[in-house]
Swiss-Prot record:
SMART domains: GuKc, LRR_SD22
Domain (LRRCT): residue spans on this chain: 337-375
Organism of derivation: Homo sapiens
Protein's name according to its UniProt entry: Leucine-rich repeat and guanylate kinase domain-containing protein
Any Pfam family the entry gives: LRR_4
MF annotations from Gene Ontology: ATP binding; guanylate kinase activity
Subunit structure, interactors included: Interacts (via guanylate kinase-like domain) with RIMBP3 (via coiled-coil region). Interacts (via guanylate kinase-like domain) with HOOK2. Interacts (via LRRCT domain) with KLC3. Interacts with HOOK1 and HOOK3.
Annotated Gene Ontology cellular component terms: acrosomal vesicle; cell projection; cytosol; manchette
Lineage of the organism: Eukaryota, Metazoa, Chordata, Craniata, Vertebrata
Gene it is expressed from: LRGUK
Length: 825
């Protein structure tokens, strides 16, 4: 006892001495600093201690402490032998106690502290603790657990256990966690019949033993071991989750027909994806950190939702083809693969796997999916819009001028007739026959194409056959109105083709595929679209085979597009103005010819095919009853509802009252535009600023004539405007040309039939009964010179003697254009 007290005092003295030494050193530093501070402070001379006073006090205290330490040291030397022997004995006893306390053997006291979750036993007869958690206790021997038969969940992770035979005595065990131990094998015990989850990760297991007795096992984790081959799992018919990460597996096998939903094989040495063909229930697959270079082997897994292939050797975009048909794939991770270096990687993968919601741990935005689709497989409408945009932008390369196809009247667009239909359905033959019969109205417009001519086709007759380089150059120069692709060839409608036909005062008749129709609908042209489609596909297929011009694949593709045309016509009412069955070309041409006659007004009955919707009720526009009516009962059938609505709105604008200043401004604008269209504008453009009366009638006000003599006089007043410097008949004299133009205004005016509206109040009535008798009108009409075209005579005999005429600006420019009313897009 005395020895221990002396040692304690010696220790305290030593510490005190060290503290004193530190305090002495600190005192010296403080003294030195105080001296330095006191030297310049001459303003405070009083109250300062001398330099030797502090040294005397500190030295006295130091001497006392050193003396006491020496006394304690001398006493300690006497008892040194006895103290060393006692310390050795005490240390040995302490080590023995520690060994007895941490021997790795589990005892009941520790078990009692680790039990939790009180519940009903497996037999249901008593209340017991169901869970035991002994994680991180450095346990080696857990044999005491043999008596705990009611356990259902056992956690022995992070210990040093080498034997788990005690688990054989736990028939109700459901979950076992034996991770991070020293196990070299597992399931070397009698299997609990209800064991569902087992975790043996991070042990020293080198092979998988036979688990055929573990029928109820649903989750098995064997991460971080030394397993080289998957085996022994064939009879685990309830196994859903299998994890073998961080092992030495090189080949995937031994998983035949197991109901595995989650499979983790990351951080192994796998080079090929094999052995997964029979895992039909697979939903989550982790093959990250391997050496896989191909995705082959992942096909036909319809339930696969998540694929993790991070840090592998996938390098080609074409590998995505193997997983593009997985219907519910949502998450894909290809980080740290060579494929990411591809410039098109992101949008290509999104396009191929449109159902993805997450790629490379990033959420995919809707805008990215739309951009990917528009880049690799744009919808037909997007293709048409891009084509139209391309040609509009490239058109600035051409000289800017007013096109010959630009008509001066808003309600009379340049007339075009488009025959659309599948390949070799007869639309080209119908177009040629139509242009031959109606040669004074239509001319065939040949498209440009990069394909070689078929047998019997002529260059510039059926198509303009050009090379791909020439075609691309024309696109870049902005010479096309539209282009489209069919098969492996390009087709395009040249601007010069349409303008050349319009320059001769004729309408264009063109045939094309549906792709060209879509692009043309984005332009400002408003043609009539007629669908020519064979309804009998077998007959159509036989016709293509007999021609001997197409391969089997081309024939099958052409026949398959018949349904496409029919579907478009059904899903988009009004997309085509008329549908003609092309099974019999003779019958089809008869119907087409009759339809064109009705369009041109060459028959007594107007075309009723355009009045498919109900007539618009405009009771406020109905005129009063009169023997010579202004409105025919069939006029509503002739005009489509869209046209009637346009006429109503247009008539409302024309009928609006305008101030004199507005009228003068409109007169000047229309006069300048008309002179420009006729090529009479002067270089200095001073005509735009001239003032004065406009000699031709304009749209600022409608004038109604009482007799044909008055109308004839009005033409004489503006005779100068009927003499354009160029025209379709340059060989005629000026007088004959003027007469023919006057007559053509009666015959080919789009509104030569009775108008569906009433003249405003106060205007002069245009019916002949109010100003002259029918006999006088007949004599006046016969006095007019008539052209000697037989079809015009037949058409003129069916017309009424009273012709209400609206003089439109520019109606005297191209009087030979056929009166095809405005279509709808």
């Amino acid at each position: 006892m005395a020895t221990s007290e002396r040692a304690l005092l010696r220790t305290r003295a030593a510490s005190l001495l060290r503290g004193l030494g530190r305090s002495r050193t600190g005192a010296r530093s403080l003294q030195f600093r105080a001296e330095k501070e006191r030297q310049p402070c001459w303003s405070f001379p009083m109250g300062q201690k001398t330099k030797g006073s502090s040294n005397i006090a500190s030295s006295y205290l130091l001497q006392q402490l050193m003396h006491r330490y020496q006394e304690l040291d001398s006493d300690g030397d006497e008892d040194q032998g006895e103290g060393e022997a006692g310390s050795e004995e005490s240390s040995e006893s302490e080590m023995l106690n520690l060994e007895e306390e941490f021997d790795g053997v589990l005892r009941e006291e520790a078990v009692a502290k680790a039990l939790h979750h009180l519940g009903r036993s497996g037999s249901g007869t008593e209340q017991v603790y169901l869970n035991l958690t002994l994680s991180g206790c450095n346990l080696i021997d857990v044999s005491i657990l043999c008596g705990y038969v009611h356990l259902q969940k056992l956690d022995l992770s992070a210990n040093k256990i080498e034997d788990l035979s005690c688990v054989s005595c736990m028939p109700y065990l459901l979950e076992l966690n034996a991770s991070q131990n020293n196990l070299t094998t597992f399931f070397n015990f009698k299997p609990p019949k209800n064991l569902k989850k087992a975790d043996f990760s991070h042990n020293q297991i080198s092979e998988i033993c036979d688990l055929s007795a573990y029928h109820a096992l649903t989750k098995l984790i064997l991460d971080g071991n030394e397993i080289e081959e998957i085996s022994g799992l064939e009879m685990c018919n309830n196994l859903i989750h299998l994890s073998l990460a961080n092992n030495k597996i090189t080949t995937i096998n031994g998983l035949n027909k197991l109901p595995i939903k989650i499979l983790c094989l990351s951080n192994n040495q796998i080079e090929m994806i094999t052995g997964l063909e029979d895992l039909k229930a697979l939903q989550n697959l982790d093959l990250s950190h391997n050496q896989i270079s191909s995705l082959q082997g992942l096909e036909n897994h319809d339930l696969l939702e998540v694929i993790n292939l991070e840090d592998n050797k996938i390098a080609e975009l074409r590998e995505i083809e193997y997983i593009k048909n997985l219907p519910i794939l949502r998450v894909l991770n290809l980080l740290e693969n060579p494929i990411q270096e591809k410039s098109e990687y992101w949008f290509f993968v999104i396009f191929m796997l449109l159902r993805l919601t997450e790629l490379d741990q990033k959420k995919i935005k809707v805008e990215e999916k739309v951009s990917a689709v528009n880049k690799y497989d744009p919808p037909p409408e997007v293709v048409a819009a891009q084509d139209h945009l391309t040609h509009v932008v490239n058109s600035v390369m051409q000289p800017q001028r007013i096109f010959d196809s630009t008509l001066p009247s808003l309600d009379a667009p340049y007339p075009m007739l488009i025959l659309a239909g599948p390949e070799a359905c007869g639309k080209r033959e119908l177009a040629h026959r139509l242009c031959r019969q109606f040669s004074t109205y239509f001319r065939y417009g040949a498209c440009h194409t990069t394909r070689p001519p078929y047998f019997g086709e002529g260059d510039r007759v059926d198509y303009h056959f050009i090379s791909q380089d020439v075609f691309d150059e024309m696109v870049n120069m902005g010479k096309f109105i539209l282009t489209f692709s069919y098969g492996n060839h390009k087709y395009g409608l040249n601007r010069d083709t349409v303008e050349g036909i319009a320059r001769d005062g004729l309408a264009s008749c063109i045939h094309m595929e549906i792709e060209g129709v879509r692009s043309l609908k984005y332009s400002y042209f408003e043609p009539r679209y007629i669908l020519v489609v064979p309804m009998n596909k077998e007959k159509y297929e036989g016709y293509l085979r007999r021609k001997g011009l197409f391969s089997r694949a081309e024939i099958e593709f052409a026949v398959s597009r018949v349904d496409l045309y029919i579907k478009i016509n059904q899903n988009f009412p009004g997309y085509f103005d008329e549908v003609i069955n092309a099974d019999d070309l003779d019958v089809a041409y008869q119907k087409l010819s009759q339809l064109i006659r009705e369009y041109l007004g060459l028959t007594e009955e107007p075309a009723k095919s355009l009045a498919t919707t109900a007539d618009v009720k405009t009771s406020h526009l109905k005129p009063e009853a009169h023997p010579t009516k202004y409105i025919s009962s069939n006029m509503g059938d002739f005009l489509h509802s869209t046209d009637r609505n346009y006429l109503i709105k247009f008539w409302a604008k024309l009928s609006a009252k305008k101030t004199p200043a507005e009228r003068d401004s409109i007169h000047r604008q229309h006069e300048a535009a008309r002179q420009a269209l006729m090529g009479r504008i002067r270089p200095d453009h001073t005509l735009l600023f001239q003032r004065g009366p406009v000699p031709a009638p304009l749209t600022s006000g409608l004038h109604y004539y009482t007799t044909l003599e008055e109308l004839w006089k009005s033409f004489d007043l503006c005779e100068d405007y009927f003499k354009p410097p160029f025209g379709p008949y340059p060989e005629k004299s000026g007088k004959d040309s003027l007469v023919s133009m006057k007559c053509s205004l009666f015959r080919f005016c789009p509104w030569s039939k009775e108008l569906p509206f009433q003249p405003p109040e106060g205007s002069i009535s245009s019916h002949l009964g109010s100003g002259a008798s029918d006999s006088e009108t007949e004599e006046t009409r016969k006095a007019l010179p008539i052209q000697s075209f037989s079809h015009e005579k037949e058409s003129h005999q069916h017309r009424q003697h009273s012709v209400p005429v609206i003089s439109r600006p520019g109606s005297n420019v191209k009087p030979t254009l056929p009166p095809i009313p405005q279509g709808r897009r």
